């Protein structure tokens, strides 16, 4: 029994995750400590994140073990309950006390629980269960609408908190999972083009030096009209394609006015970071300086100057990648990306290997979760994406994120042990 357990165990998923957790703890330790030779010059700015994170890592490893041992059919059977409880928690958090102008946490016995993190698991399971049912044909428009509803209900509740960054994760889960299930590409385009229309409209409406953005928006709309004309035999889809995009272009300015001021500032800072270097663009500016100053080999462990000077207020959470790049350089950053890539690629390979449809779809959802978090977080620290507050899995300080990431790794390991089950 023991030999069979380890024979089917996918170490290429587990080992990179363990190494990432260890690197995260080392970085958090570095943030709170100053080398002896610098103590006369720098005073450590204690966050206490390292000590607390050790506790969350231990909890996460226990959760990972349990997730690996429980028969995965339990997840499929409990998906509806997980989803329902998650929605109730998201509603409950709207009535919780506001922290820094947002309602994202529920205080349970001195610990802050972030329901939106756990809702990501529930949405992955619920989507996988719905799409795995044989009666739900992938070429059905109804399947796409119901699948989108599963995602958009929690999406809207999380936007209400407000937490725009976390809400975008749910959209990132939808399209890869739908594509993997075999949903008609034209139906996916029908849902994806409004998002692109919204982005181009935001660029056109918020950029003072507009340049080519209005022309890009016009060109994109012409492409939509041409696509609709080419599919004129399917009148419903053609009308829907044009109608959705026109509606989005008209609604985006209204939605912009309903955003919180800090959300508008983050988007504007992303579009023009140089316009407010000493204000909202400070973290991104300092993050890029820290990453660049690390060079190829880095400044060595504990010797990051931006960290020592506390130029990055969120260096233990959102901008932890900047500390890693400064102290371990390009080489350390590359190792980090390779470790994440191994987990994601191995997870996708597992999705093709596993016999059970629910398990296959869930594996793709988990890989999408990790890929989106890594791309957005690193993009945020390098100025390629807006500051969203998404954590770097296994690395950033935070109990909810650590436990969820460990749980999802445990689920992948579960699938690898039972890949032959239908």
Briefly describe each language-model feature range.
Residues 1, 377-422:
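A juxtamembrane structural motif centered on a specific transmembrane helix
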Residues 1-6, 42-44:
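Cytosolic juxtamembrane amphipathic/interface segments immediately preceding
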Residues 3, 10-12, 16-19:
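N-terminal topogenic module of multi-pass integral membrane proteins
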Residues 5-7, 143-144, 309-312, 354-355:
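Helix-boundary and loop/linker segments of multi-pass membrane transporters
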Residues 16-22, 27-28, 39-279, 325-382, ...:
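Hydrophobic alpha-helical transmembrane segments of multi-pass inner membrane proteins, especially
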Residues 34-38:
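Juxtamembrane/transmembrane-helix boundary motifs at the membrane-water interface
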Residues 168, 173-187, 306-328, 391-392, ...:
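Interfacial segments of multi-pass membrane proteins
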Residues 269-317, 328-332:
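TM-adjacent membrane-interface loops and short helices in multi-pass inner/ER membrane proteins
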């Amino acid at each position: 029994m023991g030999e069979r357990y380890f024979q089917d165990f996918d170490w290429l998923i587990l080992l990179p995750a363990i190494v990432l957790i260890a690197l995260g703890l080392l970085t958090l330790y570095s943030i709170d400590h100053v080398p002896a030779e610098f103590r006369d010059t720098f005073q450590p700015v204690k966050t206490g994140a390292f000590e607390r994170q050790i506790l969350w890592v231990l909890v996460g490893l226990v959760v990972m073990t349990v997730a690996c041992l429980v028969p995965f059919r339990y997840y499929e059977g409990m998906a509806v309950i997980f989803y329902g409880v998650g929605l109730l928690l998201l509603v409950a958090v709207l009535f919780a006390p506001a922290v820094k102008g947002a309602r994202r946490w529920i205080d349970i016995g001195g610990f802050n629980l972030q329901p939106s993190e756990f809702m990501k698991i529930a949405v992955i399971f619920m989507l996988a269960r719905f799409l795995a049912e044989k009666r739900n044909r992938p070429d059905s428009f109804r399947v796409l609408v119901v699948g989108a509803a599963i995602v958009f209900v929690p999406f809207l509740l999380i936007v209400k908190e407000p937490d725009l960054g976390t809400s975008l994760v749910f959209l990132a889960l939808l399209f890869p999972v739908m594509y993997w299930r075999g949903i008609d590409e034209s139906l996916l385009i029908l849902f994806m083009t409004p998002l692109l229309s919204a982005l181009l409209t935001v660029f056109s409406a918020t950029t003072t030096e507009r340049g080519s953005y209005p022309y890009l928006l016009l060109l994109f709309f012409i492409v939509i009209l041409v696509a609709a004309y080419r599919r004129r035999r399917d009148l419903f889809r053609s009308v829907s394609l044009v109608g959705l995009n026109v509606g989005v272009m008209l609604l985006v300015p209204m939605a912009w006015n309903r955003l919180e001021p800090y959300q508008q500032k983050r988007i504007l800072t992303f579009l023009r970071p140089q316009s407010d270097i000493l204000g909202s663009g400070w973290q991104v500016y300092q993050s890029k300086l820290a990453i660049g100053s690390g060079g190829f080999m880095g400044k060595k462990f504990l010797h990051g100057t931006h960290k020592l000077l506390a130029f990055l207020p969120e260096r233990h959470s959102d901008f932890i990648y900047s500390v890693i790049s400064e102290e371990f350089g390009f080489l350390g950053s590359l190792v980090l990306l390779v470790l994440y890539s191994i987990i994601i690629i191995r997870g996708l390979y597992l999705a093709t290997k596993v016999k059970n449809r629910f398990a296959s779809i869930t594996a793709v959802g988990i890989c999408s979760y990790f890929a989106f978090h890594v791309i957005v977080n690193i993009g945020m620290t390098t100025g390629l994406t807006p500051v969203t507050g998404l954590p770097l899995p296994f690395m950033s300080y935070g109990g909810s994120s650590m436990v969820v990431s460990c749980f999802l790794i445990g689920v992948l390991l579960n699938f690898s042990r039972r890949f032959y089950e239908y």
